[in-house]
């Protein structure tokens, strides 16, 4: 490690949960760390900031870690909205403004990556770096969407009017079946109860149903597909440091395809975590946390160099 990197010094505070008014609702978030760059952790569906619980302790000594519960998820409010991707953009933007978060290192998975890509495309000067895994992108064909045919059939059902409502709103299948099936280790009852808690009723599960229907597959929905394509063009042109994690066989992307994807980006490192499916944070928290903590000095140095250029 170069002495010129001036890496952040280990200073951390214990994680603290806070609630803040955002637009017509509230958003809950976990914060840890006291100095260094701001590291923003963005989760996906149907999880919450809880999924970062074993990763943040590795990173907090080196940066200010903030992990929000997206609107409608975790302990955040559940306003009467459609919970489209663009709703999440609106609430996340307001959240960042409310906390006066400017320059960030983004860490994201699942729909958190779509939000991270969109933020980076619109405000590249605010992005210090991006670590991501199991990411959203435009899928030209259903065959491109998932590593497992059974999962493709499940998502087709979730996108079918009436069928999706039965599966998610009534049976809570995304939390009870999809989530644990996408983690290799056995989830404990206590762990599952945390993920169940935000969704006790059919009405509370609206956000969980909406996002599978927002997935840009075969050009639909058209507005999300167009934005995702735009954001990925911006991602390919960007020069900020990137770190892509993959598991084997993965879910949205396998390790070989992920390696090739990373090679097509500028300034992107790749880490194969080994056996893993979709929720890699639940199977490889320590490895992910250590890798991000080790990568932070590189991000700091890259941004210092840019400032001097």
Swiss-Prot record:
Active site: 110, 134, 278
Enzyme Commission number(s) from the entry: 3.8.1.5
Signal peptide: none
Keyword hit for Hydrolase: yes
Gene3D superfamilies: alpha/beta hydrolase
Top-rank EC class of the record's enzyme: hydrolase
Subunit organization: Monomer.
Family per record: Belongs to the haloalkane dehalogenase family. Type 2 subfamily.
NCBIfam families found in the cross-reference section: PRK03592.1
Name of the protein in question: Haloalkane dehalogenase
């Amino acid at each position: 490690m170069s002495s010129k990197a001036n890496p952040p010094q280990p200073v951390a505070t214990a994680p603290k949960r806070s609630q803040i008014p955002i637009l017509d609702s509230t958003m809950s978030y976990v914060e840890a760390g006291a100095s260094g760059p701001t590291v923003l952790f963005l989760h996906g569906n149907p999880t919450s900031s809880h999924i970062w619980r074993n990763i943040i302790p590795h990173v907090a000594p080196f940066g200010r870690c903030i992990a929000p519960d997206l609107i409608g998820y975790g302990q955040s409010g559940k306003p009467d909205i459609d919970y489209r991707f663009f709703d999440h953009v609106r609430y996340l933007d307001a959240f960042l403004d409310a906390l006066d978060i400017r320059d960030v290192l983004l860490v994201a998975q699942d729909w958190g990556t779509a939000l991270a890509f969109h933020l980076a495309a619109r405000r590249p000067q605010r992005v210090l770096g991006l670590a991501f895994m199991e990411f959203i992108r435009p899928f030209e064909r259903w065959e491109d969407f998932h590593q497992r045919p059974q999962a493709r059939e499940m998502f087709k059902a979730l996108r079918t009017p009436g069928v999706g409502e039965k599966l998610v709103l009534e049976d809570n299948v995304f939390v009870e079946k999809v989530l644990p099936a996408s983690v290799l280790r056995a989830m404990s009852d206590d762990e599952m109860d945390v993920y169940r808690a935000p969704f006790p009723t059919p009405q509370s599960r609206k956000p969980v149903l909406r996002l599978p229907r927002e997935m840009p597959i075969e050009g639909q929905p058209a507005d999300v597909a167009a934005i995702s394509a735009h954001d990925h063009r911006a991602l390919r042109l960007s020069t900020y440091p990137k770190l892509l994690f993959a598991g084997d066989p993965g879910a949205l992307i396998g390790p070989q395809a992920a390696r090739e994807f990373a090679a097509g980006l500028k300034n992107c490192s790749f880490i194969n975590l080994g056996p893993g499916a979709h929720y890699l944070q639940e199977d490889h928290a320590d490895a992910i946390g250590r890798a991000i903590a080790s990568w932070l000095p590189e991000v700091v140095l890259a941004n210092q160099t840019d400032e001097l250029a």
